[in-house]
From Swiss-Prot:
A Pfam family recorded for this sequence: Methyltransf_29
Protein name (Swiss-Prot/TrEMBL): Probable methyltransferase PMT22
CDD domains per UniProt: AdoMet_MTases
Transmembrane segments: 11-31
GO annotation (BP), single: methylation
Lineage of the organism: Eukaryota, Viridiplantae, Streptophyta, Embryophyta, Tracheophyta
Molecular function via GO: methyltransferase activity
Native species: Arabidopsis thaliana (Mouse-ear cress)
Residues with glycosylation annotation: N64, N75, N100, N400, N469, N546
Cytoplasmic topological domain residue ranges: 1-10
EC numbers: 2.1.1.-
Length: 610
C-alpha cells in the first residue's frame, strides 16, 4: 500500500513538473521581450511584441552566393516628437497579414559590379555629336531605370572601419590596379598584400598632403582651416587625400572627379570613407547652389579654366561664396615656357574681368600655387570698363536651377548684406540662423523648430531605439535633408552626411552650406552619381510618399540597394501606407527589416545577390 501511495505521488509530481515545463515554454515562445535567438537579431535591436524580424542570414563577411491622395509638401522632413503614443499607432499591424510577406520578384543581376546607370549609358553616349567639352562624362540616364541588382566583386569583404580606412582599404573591394601603375611616381596609392595603401602623396603634394595644407594656411593665414574655412570643394580630387586630411582640421570637403580613365578614383575615396561624388565641369552646372563653398581647390585637376569661353571658371565663380578663395596649384603658375606663359596670361585676363584678385602666389618645393579671392560686392562689376562677362539676369540665377542646366556665360549678382556676409566661424555657424534665411522670418522660425525637433528625435529614437549599430556607420546620406537637421544632430559622431535636396522640393541647399554642411541636388526618379556600395546608412523622412506620385517605387528601392554596402542600413519614417508598400520589396531582396512604433522602418541589407 505504501508502495502504491509513493508511486501515485511520484506520478503527480511528474505531472506538475510537466505542466510547469510546458507553461515556461509557452511563455518563452510568446513573449519576445526574451531574446531566445540573439544571433538572429539586428544589432542593438529593441524587441517588442509587435516588431517584425523576418528570418534571414546574419551579416558577416559578404559573399557572392546565389539563392533563389492629398499631396504633402514635396521636401517635407517632419519628425515624430511624441514618444509616448507607441501603443496607439500599432493597431494596423496586428491585423495586417501581408506585412511580413515578401513580394515574389524574379530579380536579375546587372552585368558589372561597378554599374552606374546614368554614367554608363553607352547607347546614349555613342549618339553624342561632340565630346569636346566632356559631354560623355555628364549624366545620360536610360529612359527607364534598370531593375537589376549590382553583383559584388569577387571576395568582397566588410570595409575596414574609420579611421583605419583612410589609410588602407581592401584590394578585393575596389580591384582596380591601373591607378597604382599610372600614378606610381606621385605616391597616390600603392598595393601592399591584400590592401591598397594611401601614403598621402599626390601630383602636387611632393612633401605630403599635410605639409601642403599647412603651407597654404601659412601663405595666407586668413584661410583658418576649421574656423573661418569649413566647407571646401576639391576639383579633380584624385583619391581625395586632400579632403581626407582636412577632416582632421574640422573641414568638410566635397571631393569630385569624373568617371574617367583614372579608373575609380572616386570609388577609392568613398571606400576610404571620404566625402566624394562623381561630377564634371563640362557643359552643365554642377549640382550645387550659388555662393556655397568657402574655398575651392584645384591641384593639377586637368580642367581648362579658360576654355569653352571661360565657362568652367565662371562656374567656379557661381558656387564660390562672396569673399571666398580659389587655390589653384598648377604648372602655369610657376613654369615659364611659352605654352605655360600663354595659359597664365589668359587666366590673368579672365580672372581680372571677373574681378577676382590675386591675394597670394608662391612656389613650394618645385610646385607653385596662386590664391584668388572673389569679390564680396557688385561694386567692381559695375566699375568695369569692359562689361564682359556681363551680369546675369535674374531668370538665369533663380533657385533650384542647377539641375541639367547649361553653364552660365555671365556673372551672377552678389547678394547684398546681410545675406552676402560670411557665416560665423565653426562650429557656431552650425546652430546660428543661416545667412540665406535672414530675409525670410517664416523660414527662420521653421529652421529653429526643425533643429529642435531633430535634436530630440535623434537622441530619443535614432541613436538608441532603432536597429542601427552606429559603431559601423561612417558614410551617411540623408535622401531629403531639408535644413540639414538630421546631419546637424549627428555632428559629434565620427561620420559625415551627404545632404540631398530633391529637385522637386523646396530649395534649402544654401541653408545647408551656410551651416557648414555639404549637400547636393538630385532627382530620386533617376540614379545617383556614385559607385555601388558607397554608403553605410541612407535616411529618408517622408520622401517615398511624394516620390511615388512621380516615379516607380521599385526602381527607387533598387537604387538604394545599389548605393548601400552589404550590412548597411536604410532608415525610413513615412506613412503607414508607404511602409506597407516598402517592406515587402525589401524582404524580396532578402533584407532584414524592423518596425519601430509603427512609423520607423529600418532595413538591413544582406549580401544576397540573385
Amino acid at each position: 500500500m505504501i508502495k502504491n501511495i509513493f508511486q501515485s505521488r511520484k506520478l503527480s509530481g511528474l505531472c506538475v513538473l510537466s505542466i510547469l515545463l510546458v507553461s515556461v515554454t509557452i511563455l518563452l515562445l510568446t513573449n519576445d521581450t526574451i531574446d531566445l535567438f540573439p544571433y538572429l537579431s539586428l544589432p542593438y535591436l529593441p524587441r517588442s511584441s509587435l516588431s517584425v524580424i523576418p528570418t534571414s542570414t546574419p551579416i558577416s563577411s559578404p559573399t557572392n552566393d546565389s539563392s533563389p491622395p492629398l499631396e504633402s509638401p514635396v521636401n517635407q522632413t517632419r519628425v515624430d516628437d511624441h514618444p509616448d503614443d507607441q501603443g496607439l499607432e500599432l493597431d494596423w499591424l496586428k491585423d495586417d497579414k501581408q506585412w511580413n510577406v515578401s513580394l515574389k520578384i524574379d530579380w536579375k543581376r546587372c552585368e558589372s559590379p561597378d554599374y552606374i546607370p546614368c554614367l554608363d549609358n553607352t547607347k546614349a553616349i555613342k549618339k553624342l555629336k561632340s565630346k569636346r567639352n566632356m559631354e560623355h562624362r555628364e549624366r545620360h540616364c536610360p529612359e527607364r531605370s534598370p531593375k537589376c541588382l549590382v553583383p559584388l566583386p569577387q571576395h568582397y569583404k566588410v570595409p575596414l572601419p574609420w579611421p583605419q580606412s583612410r589609410d588602407m582599404i581592401w584590394y578585393d573591394n575596389v580591384p582596380h590596379p591601373k591607378l597604382v601603375e599610372y600614378k606610381k611616381d606621385q605616391n597616390w596609392v600603392r598595393k601592399s598584400g591584400p590592401f591598397f595603401v594611401f601614403p598621402g602623396g599626390g601630383t602636387q603634394f611632393k612633401d605630403g598632403v599635410i605639409h601642403y595644407i599647412n603651407f597654404i594656411q601659412k601663405t595666407l593665414p586668413i584661410l583658418d582651416w576649421g574656423k573661418k574655412v569649413r566647407v571646401v570643394l576639391d576639383v579633380g580630387c584624385g583619391v581625395a587625400s586632400f579632403g581626407g586630411t582636412l577632416l582632421d582640421k574640422n573641414v568638410i570637403t566635397m571631393s569630385f572627379a569624373p568617371k574617367d580613365e583614372h579608373e575609380a578614383q572616386i570609388q577609392f575615396a568613398l571606400e576610404r570613407g571620404i566625402p566624394a561624388t562623381l561630377a564634371v565641369i563640362g557643359t552643365q552646372k554642377l549640382p550645387f547652389p550659388d555662393n556655397a563653398y568657402d574655398v575651392i581647390h584645384c591641384a593639377r585637376c586637368r580642367v581648362h579654366w579658360h576654355g569653352y569661353g571661360g565657362r568652367p571658371l565662371l562656374e567656379l565663380n557661381r558656387v564660390l561664396r562672396p569673399g571666398g578663395f580659389f587655390v589653384w596649384s598648377a604648372t602655369p603658375v610657376y613654369q615659364h615656357d611659352e605654352g605655360h606663359r600663354n595659359v597664365w596670361k589668359t587666366m590673368e585676363s579672365l580672372t581680372t574681368s571677373m574681378c577676382w584678385k590675386v591675394v597670394a602666389r608662391t612656389r613650394f618645393t618645385k610646385v607653385g600655387f596662386v590664391i584668388y579671392q572673389k569679390p564680396d560686392s557688385d561694386s567692381c562689376y559695375e566699375s568695369r570698363k569692359n562689361k564682359d562677362p556681363p551680369l546675369c539676369i535674374e531668370e538665369e540665377t533663380k533657385k533650384n536651377s542647377s539641375w541639367y542646366t547649361p553653364l552660365l556665360t555671365c556673372l551672377p549678382k552678389l547678394p547684398v548684406s546681410p545675406i552676402g556676409k560670411w557665416p560665423s566661424g565653426w562650429p557656431e555657424r552650425l546652430t546660428e540662423t543661416p545667412v540665406s534665411l535672414f530675409r525670410e522670418q517664416r523660414s527662420e522660425e521653421s529652421f529653429r523648430e526643425d533643429s529642435k525637433l531633430w535634436s530630440g528625435v535623434m537622441s530619443n529614437i535614432y541613436l538608441y531605439s532603432l536597429a542601427i549599430n552606429w559603431t559601423r556607420i561612417h558614410n551617411v546620406m540623408d535622401m531629403n535633408a531639408g535644413y540639414g537637421g538630421f546631419a546637424a544632430a549627428l555632428i559629434n559622431k565620427p561620420l559625415w552626411v551627404m545632404n540631398v535636396i530633391p529637385v522637386e522640393g523646396e530649395d534649402t541647399l544654401s541653408t545647408i552650406f551656410d551651416r557648414g554642411l555639404i549637400g547636393i541636388y538630385h532627382d530620386w526618379c533617376e540614379s545617383f552619381n556614385t559607385y555601388p556600395r558607397s554608403y553605410d546608412l541612407l535616411h529618408s523622412s517622408f520622401l517615398f510618399t511624394n516620390l511615388s506620385q512621380r516615379c516607380d517605387l521599385m526602381e527607387v528601392v533598387v537604387e538604394i540597394d545599389r548605393i548601400l554596402r552589404p550590412g548597411g542600413y536604410l532608415a525610413v519614417q513615412d506613412t503607414v501606407e508607404m511602409l506597407k508598400k516598402l517592406n515587402p520589396i525589401l524582404l524580396s531582396l532578402r533584407w532584414s527589416t524592423n518596425l519601430y512604433r509603427g512609423k520607423f522602418l529600418v532595413g538591413l541589407k544582406s549580401s544576397w545577390r540573385p
